[in-house]
Amino acid sequence: MAEKRLSLLIPTLSKRSKLCQELTDELTRQLTTEVEFMLLPDSGQRTIGEKRNALLEAAVGDYIAFIDDDDMISPDYIEKVMTALEADPDCASLTGLIYDGSPSPRTFIHSIEYEGWYSRDGVDYRYPNHLNAVRRKYAEKVGFPEISHGEDRAYSDRIQKYLKKESKIDGVIYHYYPHGSRAK
């Protein structure tokens, strides 16, 4: 079996199976031997933090990134992430679009260049969080609080002290649909 460079981790709810299937179809189309993706479905018995920790524990890649089951990735997502990881960074930056019902999607950028989480001129700037590819050893050190809301922000706050070297990914590679808006 080939060594895995990247583990893509997807906690999912059974009620989102159609959306998750669309996502996994796209992942399967892009998959390489150096990348694994893992799903952890349930019907809401566990908190999202618990599911993220379980997936993290099962991951074997040098790097991990989470993808939310109701979001979507760009057709070149894996290629761009893997190219960024060639430089052996602590993490890779991430640019995406937020589809929140506004006339036009908003841009978000996750990078170690930004301290904290803030918005300016219609762009959301964030320190890396669960959506960014980060070294698995750092993600394992900090883990997620076993809560259902805010676990991503807590993870982001905890992991930032370990992230010193970043590879920049150009272009939009992630499509975020808050509160299940992709299903509507």
Regions found by a protein language model. Name each.
Residues 68-72:
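The conserved acidic donor/metal-binding loop of glycosyltransferases
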Residues 149-155:
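Acidic donor-binding loop at a coil-to-helix junction in glycosyltransferase catalytic cores
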Residues 43-59:
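Glycine-rich, basic loop-to-helix element that forms the pyrophosphate-binding segment
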Residues 64:
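Short aromatic/hydrophobic "clamp" motif used to bind/position activated sugar donors
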Residues 169-184:
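Active-site donor/metal-binding and catalytic loop motifs
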Residues 99, 114-134:
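A recurrent flexible, glycine/aromatic-enriched loop bordering the glycosyltransferase active site
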Residues 22-37:
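Short, acidic, metal-binding catalytic loop of nucleotide-sugar glycosyltransferases
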Residues 76-107:
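Conserved donor NDP-sugar-binding/catalytic core segment of glycosyltransferases
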